[in-house]
């Protein structure tokens, strides 16, 4: 409890003194702060020392009209041109965030036209993806190594291996096996991968400094991959009875012909299930990051609310106490949400897969009156 009080005191002092460096006449763009954390980027912004940002420059790999080019993102100028773009080598520029076409993306200027080159650069999101994948491999391979060296009747593992063993078995037993039954071993690798990757990505997104801080599950491309993969597994492994119930369900005939109302609804449901997985995970994680950043941005706004420095300091200090308390609460809530979202995604994926394994309806036993 004593250490918790010291931590909260240091946090309040940090949030109180940091905004004092901001000029009272400087406008705080909350939208830029929020989207700067959520959106993808060719560099990893860490902090700002005075007027100099501290960033990790990432590799740029593009194929333009002049061929393949590999260089560092630091080659792009920090000074923006008349259009608000950041010029770089080989007639390449990074478009500004407010551009109607390709915002924050690399384009090639060919005469008066702007052409989007083949871009396979290692962006912030890709870098976070690699880091989370490495952490996930370590979390799985270390317990796997222990299992290979021990017998089934050996004492239960302790420490990190014991924690991961408990985690894996709880998800497998309570979610996957309880939903899929005998089919559980077949789909357990994918469902366990979904749970642990989403959970690791969510937890790493809460960490405010590298290698954390990336909002991977708040990126629609990441959630689309998981949703589409579950969609493909569900439908390509479905039974004949599953497809029969979609195109010719056991409902009154007038609901199927001449207007195929129920088949259309069932077919539409095939696509809404993965869409629900995608939107639920994306929206929840992006909203959590946005709310946490909003509490921090309120401090800077209150320190620049008027021209009176004393009034700004009083308002900012008072809001700092409230903001730090709410931010701490949101961080704890984000940890809980990180687990819940990973569990819900895995559970719904298992349910959707189980619904595709419909067996032939057996004849009901006759009831003796």
Predicted regions and their residues:
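Cytosolic juxtamembrane amphipathic/interface segments immediately preceding
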Residues: 115-117, 169-183
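Hydrophobic alpha-helical transmembrane segments and adjacent short intramembrane/lumenal linkers
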Residues: 192-196, 200-207, 217, 221-225, ...
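Perimembrane topogenic segments of multi-pass inner/organellar membrane proteins
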Residues: 2-6, 20-158
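Membrane-interface helix termini and inter-helical loops of multi-pass transporters
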Residues: 209-213
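Bacterial N-terminal signal peptides
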Residues: 10-19
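Alpha-helical transmembrane segments
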Residues: 4-11, 130, 187-191, 219, ...
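Juxtamembrane interface elements at the cytosolic ends of transmembrane helices
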Residues: 138-176, 238-245, 360-361
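Membrane-interface helix starts
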Residues: 6, 179-189, 283
């Amino acid at each position: 409890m004593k250490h918790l009080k010291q931590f909260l005191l240091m946090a309040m002092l940090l949030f109180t003194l940091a905004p004092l460096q901001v000029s009272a006449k400087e406008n705080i763009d909350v939208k830029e702060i929020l989207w700067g954390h959520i959106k993808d980027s060719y560099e990893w912004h860490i902090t700002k020392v005075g007027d100099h940002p501290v960033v990790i420059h990432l590799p740029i790999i593009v194929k333009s009209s002049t061929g393949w080019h590999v260089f560092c993102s630091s080659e792009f100028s920090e000074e923006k041109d008349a259009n608000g773009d950041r010029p770089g080598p080989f007639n390449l520029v990074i478009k500004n965030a407010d551009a109607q076409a390709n915002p924050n993306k690399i384009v090639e200027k060919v005469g008066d036209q702007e052409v989007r080159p083949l871009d396979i650069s290692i962006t912030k999101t890709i870098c976070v993806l690699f880091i989370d994948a490495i952490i996930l491999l370590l979390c799985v391979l270390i317990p796997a190594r222990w299992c290979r060296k021990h017998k089934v009747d050996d004492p239960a593992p302790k420490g990190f291996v014991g924690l991961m063993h408990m985690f894996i078995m709880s998800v497998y037993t309570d979610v996957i096996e309880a939903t899929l039954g005998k089919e559980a071993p077949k789909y357990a690798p994918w469902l366990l991968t979904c749970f642990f990757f989403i959970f690791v990505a969510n937890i790493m997104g809460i960490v405010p400094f590298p290698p954390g801080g990336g909002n991977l599950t708040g990126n629609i491309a990441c959630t689309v991959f998981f949703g589409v993969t579950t969609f493909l597994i569900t439908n390509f492994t479905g039974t004949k009875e599953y497809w029969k119930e979609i195109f010719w369900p056991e409902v009154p005939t007038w609901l199927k012909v001449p207007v195929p109302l129920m088949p259309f609804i069932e077919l539409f449901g095939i696509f809404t299930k993965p869409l629900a997985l995608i939107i639920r995970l994306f929206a929840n994680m992006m909203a959590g990051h946005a709310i946490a950043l909003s509490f921090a941005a309120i401090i800077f706004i209150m320190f620049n609310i008027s021209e009176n420095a004393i009034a700004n300091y009083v308002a900012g200090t008072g809001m700092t106490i409230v903001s730090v308390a709410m931010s701490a609460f949101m961080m704890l809530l984000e940890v809980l949400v990180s687990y819940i979202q990973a569990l819900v995604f895995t559970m719904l994926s298992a349910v959707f897969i189980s619904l595709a394994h419909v067996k032939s309806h057996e004849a009901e036993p006759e009831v003796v009156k």
